[in-house]
């Protein structure tokens, strides 16, 4: 009986220590996501259109414009 009380006491102390450690860590502050206008402005800059990553997108746009112009 005395042994189980001591084990329960140590378990309670361990749980309290874990809860204290969890409560001491501050929660991360979520960053605000950029708005759609700011994101669109970033993609519409001349530097973004001149980058090599934009070549496939520009190819799709030019082919769509060519196909629409033929009709």
UniProtKB/Swiss-Prot annotation:
GO cellular component: extracellular region; membrane; other organism cell membrane
Record flagged with keyword Nuclease: no
Molecular-function GO terms, alphabetical: toxin activity
Modified residues (Leucine amide): 68
Tissue-wise expression: Expressed by the venom gland.
Intracellular or extracellular location(s): Secreted; Target cell membrane
Main localisation: secreted
Propeptide segments, given as residue ranges: 25-54
Keyword line: Amidation, Antibiotic, Antimicrobial, Cytolysis, Fungicide, Immunity, Innate immunity, Membrane, Repeat, Secreted, Signal, Target cell membrane, Target membrane, Toxin
Each AXPX repeat, start to end: 24-27, 32-35, 44-47, 50-53, 54-57
This protein's record includes keyword Transmembrane helix: no
Signal peptide (residue range): 1-24
Superkingdom of source: Eukaryota
Family designation: Belongs to the MCD family. Protonectin subfamily.
Name recorded for this polypeptide: Venom peptide 2-long
Organism: Orancistrocerus drewseni
Lineage, highest ranks first: Eukaryota, Metazoa, Ecdysozoa, Arthropoda, Hexapoda
């Amino acid at each position: 009986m005395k042994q189980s009380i001591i084990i329960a006491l140590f378990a309670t102390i361990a749980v309290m220590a874990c809860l204290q450690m969890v409560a001491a860590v501050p929660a991360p502050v979520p960053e605000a996501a950029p708005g759609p206008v700011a994101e669109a402005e970033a993609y519409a800059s001349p530097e973004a259109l001149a980058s090599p990553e934009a070549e496939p997108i520009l190819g799709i746009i030019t082919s769509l414009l060519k196909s629409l112009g033929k009709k």
